[in-house]
Amino acid sequence: MFALPGYDAFLGFLLISAAVPILALVTNKLLAPRSRTGERELTYESGMEPIGGAWIQFNIRYYMFALVFVIFDVETVFLYPWAVAFHRLGLLAFIEALIFIAILLVALAYAWRKGALEWS
């Protein structure tokens, strides 16, 4: 099909995975009702008029907890393949993983010391 043999299946998958959402959006555009009456523009919240505004200020502590979670979630993404291939990688990969974990533990200690993990 093209210059890289063996990638035909990948190219087919790529084309299909791009075509399906585009086809869904085009179909929605063609078949969806187009009337924009005042009734359709109202917000709906469990059959009642909404109370208060939609824009509220979140406490910064939510952001800090989410940021620390994402950091350690990404750590898991990096360490899982290493753990699966641990027996083939040798001592150097083990030392590199220990350095990676040590850097993240220093970051955790810093966040803890700064009070980012405390809710007061």
From Swiss-Prot:
Cellular component terms per the entry's GO annotation: NADH dehydrogenase complex; plasma membrane-derived thylakoid membrane
Transmembrane stretches, by residue range?
6-26, 64-84, 89-109
**Which EC numbers characterise this protein's activity in its record?**
7.1.1.-
**EC top class named in words:** translocase
Does the keyword Flavoprotein belong to this entry? no
The UniProt record lists the keyword Transmembrane helix: yes
Give the record's keywords alphabetically: Membrane, NAD, NADP, Plastoquinone, Quinone, Thylakoid, Translocase, Transmembrane, Transmembrane helix, Transport
**Cross-referenced InterPro entries:** NAD(P)H_OxRDtase_bac/plastid, NADH_UbQ/plastoQ_OxRdtase_su3, NDAH_ubi_oxred_su3_sf
Gene Ontology BP annotations: photosynthesis, light reaction
Using the record, list the residue span of the signal peptide; answer none if the entry has no such feature: none
Q: Which GO terms describe its molecular function?
A: NADH dehydrogenase (ubiquinone) activity; quinone binding
Q: What is its main location?
A: membrane
User: What Pfam families does the entry give?
Assistant: Oxidored_q4
User: Mind telling me which HAMAP family this protein's record contains?
Assistant: NDH1_NuoA
Q: What does this protein do?
A: NDH-1 shuttles electrons from an unknown electron donor, via FMN and iron-sulfur (Fe-S) centers, to quinones in the respiratory and/or the photosynthetic chain. The immediate electron acceptor for the enzyme in this species is believed to be plastoquinone. Couples the redox reaction to proton translocation, and thus conserves the redox energy in a proton gradient. Cyanobacterial NDH-1 also plays a role in inorganic carbon-concentration.
What protein family does this chain belong to? Answer: Belongs to the complex I subunit 3 family.
- Subunit structure and binding partners: NDH-1 can be composed of about 15 different subunits; different subcomplexes with different compositions have been identified which probably have different functions.
Q: What is this protein called?
A: NAD(P)H-quinone oxidoreductase subunit 3
Source organism: Prochlorococcus marinus (strain MIT 9313)
